[in-house]
């Protein structure tokens, strides 16, 4: 389930709205994750991946950045990733419609705290069993979540490395992978041509040999 939600202005990490689920039954202490969420938001910038998942033990942080605003959710690790991003994109659409024009000018933290009402209502709809059954419909409307970058929250925070740097490394790895596939294809093509040429030489040699033999 979704345990915590934060909406933050990326430019200066100003919190705009937030919501936390009651977790008294499980007895889990979410303060550690609250601290990690704040640290994470301070690392975001314009070059950060627009969508990312950060693993945090038995929990996962998922976020979406749109129009300079980050929508961050803390979920149990077992909560479907596709539902998490569907939830965040749902929040983004509604928040942008209601407050998008005001976001650049506010200076007070949690200026849109009343948005918590919509957050709570949306969370309930996404943990409902019917929402899980409709996951297939959600899939067709979402970006390919398999392409969303995944990192470890502890590594990101301890290294003090901006998420944009991780995105750059991921892009470099992707480029290297593409280059490797291209080089491999080129080598395979050359190998095929070499085999064909060798076969042609053998056939021509046999033809010449037969002609001279019968002559």
From Swiss-Prot:
GO terms for biological process: endoplasmic reticulum to Golgi vesicle-mediated transport; protein transport; retrograde vesicle-mediated transport, Golgi to endoplasmic reticulum; vesicle fusion with Golgi apparatus. SMART domains: Longin. It is found in: Endoplasmic reticulum membrane; Endoplasmic reticulum-Golgi intermediate compartment membrane; Golgi apparatus, cis-Golgi network membrane; Golgi apparatus, trans-Golgi network membrane. The keyword Membrane applies. PROSITE patterns: LONGIN, V_SNARE. One of its GO terms (cellular component) is ER to Golgi transport vesicle membrane. Keywords: Coiled coil, Endoplasmic reticulum, ER-Golgi transport, Golgi apparatus, Membrane, Protein transport, Transmembrane, Transmembrane helix, Transport. Residues 6-119 form the Longin domain. The chain crosses the membrane at residues 191-213. One of its GO terms (molecular function) is SNAP receptor activity. The keyword Transport applies. PANTHER family: VESICLE-TRAFFICKING PROTEIN SEC22B. Component of 2 distinct SNARE complexes. This is Vesicle-trafficking protein SEC22b-A. It comes from Danio rerio (Zebrafish).
């Amino acid at each position: 389930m979704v345990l915590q939600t934060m909406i933050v202005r990326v430019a200066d990490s100003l919190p705009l709205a937030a919501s936390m689920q009651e977790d008294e039954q499980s007895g889990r202490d979410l303060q550690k994750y609250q601290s990690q969420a704040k640290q994470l938001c301070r690392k975001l910038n314009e070059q950060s991946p627009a969508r990312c998942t950060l693993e945090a033990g038995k929990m996962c942080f998922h976020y979406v950045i749109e129009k300079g605003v980050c929508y961050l959710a803390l979920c149990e690790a077992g909560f479907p990733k596709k539902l998490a991003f569907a939830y965040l994109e749902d929040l983004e659409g509604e928040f942008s419609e209601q407050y998008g024009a005001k976001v650049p000018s506010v200076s007070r933290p949690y200026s849109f705290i009343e948005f918590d009402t919509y957050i709570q209502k949306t969370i309930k709809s996404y943990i409902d069993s019917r929402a899980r059954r409709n996951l297939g419909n959600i899939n067709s409307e979402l970006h390919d979540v398999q392409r969303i970058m995944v990192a470890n929250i502890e590594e990101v925070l301890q290294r003090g490395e901006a998420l944009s740097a991780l995105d750059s490394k991921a892009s470099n790895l992707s480029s290297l992978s593409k280059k490797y596939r291209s080089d491999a294809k080129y080598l395979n093509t050359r190998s095929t041509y070499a085999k064909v040429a060798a076969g042609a030489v053998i056939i021509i040699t046999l033809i010449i040999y037969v002609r001279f033999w019968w002559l």
